[in-house]
Design a protein with these regions (language model features):
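Alpha/beta-hydrolase-fold serine-hydrolase catalytic core, especially in secreted/extracellular enzymes
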Residues: 264-265, 273-310
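Short amphipathic alpha-helix adjacent to the substrate-entry channel of hydrolases
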Residues: 110-129
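Short beta-strand element of the alpha/beta-hydrolase
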Residues: 95-104
């Protein structure tokens, strides 16, 4: 399945809210009553409604309510990423398939909260992470972070006291990211070819290597086809006019990643007409529908989901 889609009439939006699981005290939680509530049973701040038909911030529109696991509650703190939070569905179909999410340049773990809530509300374990250095970590380092986070999810399957003990599908892990994180998802695929799927949200990719790339402006950066030569099924969201915003990334955006990946790899590029670099940053409309159906098809073997991708 190798198709290019141009989708019209996107509505761009921004998400402005507190990310409740990051608030560690009841008093902090109560400062955001429109979004958050304190759970007396878990001593944790959580999103109001916790998912299930539009709970949380309104992006988690799936049928399941969800909860979170933070590092203060025993989640492993991996060396290759920072600020991991796991979201998991309540009373979903087990064992749970997992997806790990990482942000773009300058962003932290909380930037991916809306996507994590969305996937958890649809029955997946979703872990959001941030890079150790939001400015200086390379695409490759962020890819290592995605793989390291998978190890943290795996350890929840055997950790005493974890609500996910015995509930994790140990053979089904996918990765996703926005912008620089979207490019890092392909680094992760090169590191671990057993990944089930990739969802790249307005990805960028840079390889700094003077053996492969021409020296321009004091730097040797480019897209090296050999470094996206993997077979992991990939859904790539790209804005038609992204290059107008990111002129320095000519040849290194989603369209370029798609065209340089092997023809044998199952891949789709979803190009937003007249859209820029941020149109897939948050789950909404056609973007979230395609992302969810990509996972349903490649992870849950849902043939009907395949029809929705054509």
């Amino acid at each position: 399945m190798k198709h290019t889609f141009i989708i019209f009439n996107f509505i761009l939006f921004s998400l402005v809210s507190a990310d409740c699981p990051d608030l560690t005290t009841e008093s902090e939680c109560n400062e955001w009553p429109q979004y958050c509530e304190w759970n007396e049973d878990t001593n944790q701040c959580q999103n109001i409604g916790g998912g299930g038909d539009g709970g949380g911030n309104g992006d988690a529109d799936g049928p399941y309510e969800y909860m979170t696991i933070t590092e203060s509650q025993g989640l492993r703190n991996g060396p290759d990423y920072r600020d991991g939070v796991v979201y998991y569905p309540i009373n979903g179909e087990t064992p749970y398939k997992s997806i790990v999410l990482t942000p773009g340049f300058g962003g932290g773990s909380s930037e991916m909260a809306a996507w994590a809530e969305f996937y958890a509300s649809h029955g997946f374990i979703a872990m959001r992470i941030g890079p150790n250095d939001e400015i200086n970590d390379s695409h490759y380092q962020r890819g290592l972070g995605l793989i390291d986070a998978i190890e943290s999810i795996k350890q929840e399957n055997s950790r005493t006291g974890s609500p996910l003990n015995g509930l994790v599908d140990m053979d089904s892990f996918s990765v996703s990211g926005y912008s620089m994180g979207g490019g890092a998802s392909h680094d992760a695929a090169m590191i671990d070819g057993s990944l089930k799927a990739i969802i790249s949200l307005n990805p960028t990719v840079i390889f700094e290597d003077c053996d492969y790339c021409p020296l321009e402006g004091g730097y040797c950066i480019c897209l090296v086809p050999e470094f996206v030569d993997h077979s992991v099924p990939s859904l790539i969201f790209a804005g038609e006019v992204e290059l107008n915003e990111l002129t320095a990334y000519e040849g290194m955006l989603g369209q370029d990643i798609y065209s340089n990946m092997p023809e044998s790899t199952d891949k789709i590029m979803f190009e937003g007409a007249n859209s820029g670099h941020g149109f897939a940053a948050y789950p909404s409309g056609e973007v979230s529908n395609y992302a969810l159906n990509w996972l349903k098809y490649h992870i849950l073997d849902d043939v009907d989901a395949c029809e929705s991708l054509l």
